[in-house]
């Protein structure tokens, strides 16, 4: 029977909170604590999210801090869910609130790799501050963001603990204070750009989570990259030149592949670290990426699609959906020969406009047949 929970600290992982409860409660066995906390008897406590809690435990959590606050402020949802499309993000959030395991399939987590080869990390300087302020330290969310090796506040390298994040590891509730040593080595990062990126990403991670936006992260990135990397017509980006400059900017260190960048710009990939990396390269302020302004929704309309929309008197969104479908098919065909020659972006733009017109005409019908549905 659980009678109390300790104070929940700022940015503390829910796993850390339950671990401190276990340590302070004097259980004779881990199994007794797991039985009191969780619905499933043989559960392995999740280091990044929350396993299904017993009803009476959930009631205590609600009274203490609220399930919404626990999910938004004390799990890794801000990393894996921040840049998802609105509908998918909302579905994942509901699954997390219900403590339903299918959230793993909804979040932007590398397939079958959540926790693989990773351990809980800590910042030596944050540990010192925690011990001074609270008399103990705890596991911070901000130190567990995949791809970031540096504390965004102090600019020092994060240290690895012995606590595995593997989902198949032996069950445990490892309290940070009992795991992290008293004597700590501090290694400052001397790479200014790497430290700046860590601080940039951490500030976005800590920002308020938007659930409704008129502009997707892919649309926003393309909008901000269009001026320096747009093709002649403005429909597409010169991906090869963009990728080359991006690699040079980061010195080829921890950069994503060109294919992964393309998927992000097509709205098919939502990796938190890679998006932050591309955004910082593009010079986008933290505040704008954390909460993409709705005011630019009308500005991002593609000029070619606007032209077709006005000429044919059709809804812009219909024209855009058809045009993007044509673009994807064209790019897929040309990608096969990319290694053999330079991609002819301007030529592609010239060919796109008539193709979009032809496709829309077919969808509209000839007056005798019904218009086709666009999916």
What is the predicted function of each stretch?
Residues 1-375:
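Basic, alpha-helical nucleic-acid-binding regions used in initiation and control of genome expression
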């Amino acid at each position: 029977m659980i009678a109390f929970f300790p104070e929940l600290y700022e940015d503390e992982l829910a796993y850390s909170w339950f671990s401190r409860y276990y340590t302070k409660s004097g259980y004779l066995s881990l199994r007794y604590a797991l039985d009191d906390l969780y619905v499933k008897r043989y559960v392995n406590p999740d280091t990044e999210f929350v396993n299904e809690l017993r009803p009476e435990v959930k009631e205590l959590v609600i009274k203490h801090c609220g399930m919404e606050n626990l999910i938004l402020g004390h799990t890794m949802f801000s990393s894996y869910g921040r840049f998802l499309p609105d509908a998918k993000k909302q579905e994942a959030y509901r699954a997390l609130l219900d403590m339903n395991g299918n959230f793993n399939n909804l979040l932007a987590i590398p397939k079958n790799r959540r926790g693989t080869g990773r351990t809980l990390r800590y910042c030596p300087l944050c540990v010192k501050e925690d011990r001074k302020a609270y008399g103990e330290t705890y596991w911070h969310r901000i130190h567990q963001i995949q791809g970031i090796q540096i504390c965004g506040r102090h600019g020092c390298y994060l240290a690895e603990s012995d606590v595995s994040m593997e989902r198949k590891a032996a069950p445990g509730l490892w309290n940070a204070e009992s795991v992290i040593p008293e004597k700590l080595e501090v290694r400052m990062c001397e790479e200014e750009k790497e430290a700046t990126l860590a601080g940039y990403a951490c500030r976005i991670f800590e920002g308020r989570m938007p659930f409704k936006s008129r502009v997707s992260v892919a649309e926003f990135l393309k909008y901000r990259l269009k001026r320096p990397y747009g093709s002649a017509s403005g429909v597409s980006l010169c991906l090869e030149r963009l990728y080359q400059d991006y690699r040079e900017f980061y010195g080829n260190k921890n950069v994503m592949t060109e294919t992964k960048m393309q998927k992000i710009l097509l709205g098919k990939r939502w990796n938190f670290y890679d998006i932050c990396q591309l955004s910082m390269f593009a010079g986008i302020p933290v505040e704008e990426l954390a909460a993409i302004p709705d005011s630019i929704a009308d500005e991002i309309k593609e000029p070619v699609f606007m032209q077709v929309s006005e000429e044919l008197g059709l809804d812009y969104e219909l024209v855009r959906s058809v045009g993007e479908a044509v673009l994807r098919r064209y790019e897929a065909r040309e990608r096969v020969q990319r290694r053999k020659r330079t991609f002819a972006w301007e030529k592609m733009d010239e060919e796109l406009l008539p193709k979009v017109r032809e496709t829309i005409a077919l969808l509209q019908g000839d007056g005798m047949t019904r218009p086709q549905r666009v999916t």
